Design a protein with these regions (language model features):
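Acidic/charged coordination and interface sites in well-structured regions
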Residues: 3
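Bacterial flagellar/type III secretion structural subunits and associated motility module proteins
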Residues: 6-235
């Protein structure tokens, strides 16, 4: 009898878990907030029992990475620095990297910026780089942290300097690698009027809903967004 009872309990639990997993979440602004329903179990109790079937959220800000954008320089103009070996240090909260590169006679700003972009992107430093172009024939190197949100330590995800580097210095100042620094921000939002924040744009609410904010949407901030579960017939 005990074995039969345990079997029935197991089947009941499996049926409940299957029922919970088939429920479908909705957002009435899916372009701004997408949602999935993924309840978890903690100490034998599913978050299904604690999570509300409906809540209202609004977004005040999105999580962003740190971005350093260099000076915009005429792309086709030769670099006005002596040819030779240069280096600069990229310092993160965890590691200290020295990036070494050569400047060849006749290298243009665009050539050098793309060389540094490839060097950074091939080095697995926790940042990535791209060359930006404007309508005036100028280009800039933008370096962006892979991490989003306010750093756990310090104010920056990374810092660039050539004050104590091992090869020729001066390229950080010449290119303006620290000219425009956009610091990282946390996502800021409310759940049923209560202020919340997150390091990233994907996070869990009530340990049952996985929410993803979409900064690329053109929707106005502070819009009230309805999130919840479809009634069973629509699940």
């Amino acid at each position: 009898a005990k074995s039969l009872h345990e079997t029935i309990d197991t089947l009941s639990c499996d049926d409940e878990n299957q029922l919970f997993s088939t429920k479908t979440a909705y957002s009435d602004h899916p372009g701004q907030v997408s949602v999935s329903y993924e309840p978890t179990e903690n100490q034998g109790v599913s978050s299904y029992y604690k999570a509300p079937a409906h809540f209202v959220m609004s977004i005040q800000d999105y999580a962003t990475p740190q971005r350093n954008t260099s000076s915009y320089l005429t792309s086709s103009q030769p670099v006005m620095m002596p040819a030779g070996s240069y280096s600069f240090d990229l310092i993160t909260n965890k590691l200290h990297y020295e990036l070494q590169f050569d400047l060849q006679p006749g290298d243009t700003h665009d050539t050098l910026q793309h060389r540094l972009m490839r060097l950074i992107n091939n080095s697995d430093l926790g940042v990535h780089a791209e060359v930006l172009q404007d309508d005036s024939g100028r280009s800039a190197l933008q370096i962006t942290s892979d991490a989003y949100g306010i750093p756990a330590k310090g104010n920056e995800h990374f810092r660039i300097t050539d004050d104590n580097t091992s090869h020729s210095s001066g390229m950080v100042h010449y290119l303006g690698l620290n000219k425009d620094i956009e610091t990282a921000r946390n996502a800021a939002y409310t759940i049923d009027g209560e202020p919340q924040s997150s390091y990233g744009n994907t996070f869990r609410v009530y340990d049952a809903y996985e929410i993803t904010l979409h900064p690329e949407s053109a929707a106005d901030k502070n819009t009230e967004i309805q999130v919840g579960l479809y009634p069973d017939p629509q699940s």
